[in-house]
């Protein structure tokens, strides 16, 4: 007996985009478009009729604001939503807000008239729809419940060995990273993060986090020193690596080929942390689709790092953590709301502030 196809409803005010999305989705053997809508009001009626598994939603819509529609949808009828965003500053800000409201993930709008690259784009959309269809989606009220307590400051004497927190995430990771970073104290060791995200969105992501956290959050720059009390987000379309300059840690950006079909890649960051950080590293792998980071986390463990993975129950998609656990790179499996505390508790076992200034 063949498995039922993933039912997709496409909502976009552009007839051309609706047509292209339908063509892409219907070309896949395991999914089909069961309806299209030019605006959220039409979509609202269609949802009741066709009961889709996944909704693709344009971030900027007529008649009803896309964010208003998403907020109501996640409160009244939670379902996996994949945002389709334009590559603009306004588009990236709206997309970040949509992810906060409960959207599972986003894709950028296809470049119309450019058939080259459409194959890669087709694969990306298909993969994200598959991941969305398996995502754990909760009502909004449930998502905001049980905020993590503030992690304790590290009050022990300074140690000459500088500690680092190295993080990888994908689908569902923007909110997971926020939940992980916000409890960290101002004297936290430096945090380096790869979140799968295209160019043009990571700066907005870092800016939004910076306004919420007690540490400074920024998009990583090539050659800058990696300092305690800072979190560095890998820029979209660039690998982020840990490097050394004398006794100091520095950020290194690379345009080398994608790894595991991703640039930035979690494995690339984790591999560099294994080489240059070793036992000074605490590794964290959060919600995400695929296996990026699994091999790198094992290499970090073999180099002396202590690694934690988000548990299945709190993941939007239990892909990357599951693969890292299966590969043998993980010491602890932890619910997201306890992750910051567990990381800081582990660092406290060093009996040191875990940083050098």
Swiss-Prot record:
Is RNA-binding found in the keyword set?
no
Record's GO cellular component, any one? cytoplasm
User: Which residues, if any, are the signal sequence?
Assistant: none
Reaction(s) catalysed (UniProt annotation): [protein]-L-glutamate 5-O-methyl ester + H2O = L-glutamyl-[protein] + methanol + H(+); L-glutaminyl-[protein] + H2O = L-glutamyl-[protein] + NH4(+)
State the family it belongs to. Belongs to the CheB family.
Which CDD domains does the entry mention?
Answer: CheB_Rec, REC_CheB-like
Domain Response regulatory intervals = 7-124
Role summary: Involved in chemotaxis. Part of a chemotaxis signal transduction system that modulates chemotaxis in response to various stimuli. Catalyzes the demethylation of specific methylglutamate residues introduced into the chemoreceptors (methyl-accepting chemotaxis proteins or MCP) by CheR. Also mediates the irreversible deamidation of specific glutamine residues to glutamic acid.
Please give the name of this protein: Protein-glutamate methylesterase/protein-glutamine glutaminase 1
Tell me the SMART domains matching this sequence. Answer: REC (SM00448)
One Gene Ontology molecular-function label: protein-glutamine glutaminase activity
> For this protein, what post-translational modification is recorded in UniProt?
Phosphorylated by CheA. Phosphorylation of the N-terminal regulatory domain activates the methylesterase activity.
Give the EC number(s) listed in the UniProt record: 3.1.1.61, 3.5.1.44
Entry keywords, A to Z: Chemotaxis, Cytoplasm, Hydrolase, Phosphoprotein, Plasmid
Q: Could you tell me which HAMAP family the record lists for this protein?
A: CheB_chemtxs (MF_00099)
Source species of the chain: Cupriavidus metallidurans (strain ATCC 43123 / DSM 2839 / NBRC 102507 / CH34) (Ralstonia metallidurans)
Q: Which domain of life does the UniProt lineage start with?
A: Bacteria
Q: Which residues carry this modification: 4-aspartylphosphate?
A: 58
**Ranges for domain CheB-type methylesterase:** 158-350
Stretches of the chain forming a coiled coil according to its record = none
Q: What is the lineage of its organism?
A: Bacteria, Pseudomonadati, Pseudomonadota, Betaproteobacteria, Burkholderiales
Quoted from the entry, the domain comment is: Contains a C-terminal catalytic domain, and an N-terminal region which modulates catalytic activity.
Q: Kindly report, in one word, the top-level EC class recorded for this enzyme.
A: hydrolase
> Active site annotated at which positions?
170, 196, 292
Q: Which Gene Ontology biological process is one annotated for this entry?
A: chemotaxis
Subcellular location, in the record's words? Cytoplasm
């Amino acid at each position: 007996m063949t498995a039922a196809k993933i039912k997709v409803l496409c909502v976009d005010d552009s007839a051309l985009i609706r047509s292209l999305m339908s063509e892409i989705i219907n070309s896949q053997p395991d999914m089909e478009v069961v309806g299209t809508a030019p605006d959220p009001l039409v979509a609202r009626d269609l949802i009741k009729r066709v009961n889709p598994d996944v909704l693709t939603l344009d971030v900027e819509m007529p008649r009803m604001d896309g964010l208003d529609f998403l907020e109501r949808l996640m409160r009244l009828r939670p379902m996996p939503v994949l945002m389709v965003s334009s590559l603009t500053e306004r588009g990236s800000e709206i997309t970040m807000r949509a992810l906060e409201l409960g959207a599972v993930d986003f894709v950028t709008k296809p470049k119309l008239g450019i058939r080259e690259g459409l194959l890669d784009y087709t694969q990306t959309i298909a993969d994200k729809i598959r991941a969305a269809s398996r995502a754990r989606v909760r009502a909004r009220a449930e998502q905001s419940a049980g905020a993590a307590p503030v992690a304790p400051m590290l009050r022990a004497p300074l140690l000459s060995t500088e500690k680092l927190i190295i993080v990888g995430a994908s689908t569902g990771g923007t909110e997971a990273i926020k939940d992980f970073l916000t409890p960290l104290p101002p004297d936290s060791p430096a945090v380096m993060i790869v979140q799968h995200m295209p160019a043009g969105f990571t700066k907005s992501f870092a800016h939004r986090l910076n306004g919420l956290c007690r540490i400074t959050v920024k998009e990583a720059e090539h050659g800058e020193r990696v300092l305690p009390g800072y979190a560095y987000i890998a820029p979209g379309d660039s690998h982020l690596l840990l490097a050394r300059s004398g006794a100091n840690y520095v950020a290194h950006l690379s345009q080398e080929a994608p790894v595991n079909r991703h640039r930035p890649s979690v494995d690339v960051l984790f591999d560099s942390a294994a080489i240059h950080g070793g036992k000074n590293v605490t590794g964290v792998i959060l919600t995400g689709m695929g296996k990026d980071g699994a091999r790198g986390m094992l290499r970090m463990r073999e180099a002396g790092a202590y690694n934690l993975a988000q548990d299945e129950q709190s993941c939007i998609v239990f892909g990357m953590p599951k693969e890292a656990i299966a590969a043998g790179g993980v010491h602890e499996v932890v619910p997201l709301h306890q992750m910051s505390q567990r990381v800081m508790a582990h660092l406290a076992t060093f009996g040191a502030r875990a940083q050098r200034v």
